[in-house]
């Protein structure tokens, strides 16, 4: 069953770190079945705290999503995201 990793950027602190994160995070998907469904496009917050941006990645299963998220390559990129901004990240199963 499909699974979705959703990233919501709440605040950016360091544009340089975010640029480097974006490049490394993109490269980290090599060998993983990640399909981008939304990638920093126009966003409109309808409820809750204001969001600046979002990314939605589709994976075939929750296990495959976790495997990418926990991979060494993504964890290296993730450290840059922590420097660059405040995000909320969650994994949800599709129907």
Regions found by a protein language model. Give the residues of each.
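C-terminal structural segments of small proteins and small subunits
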Residues: 62-90
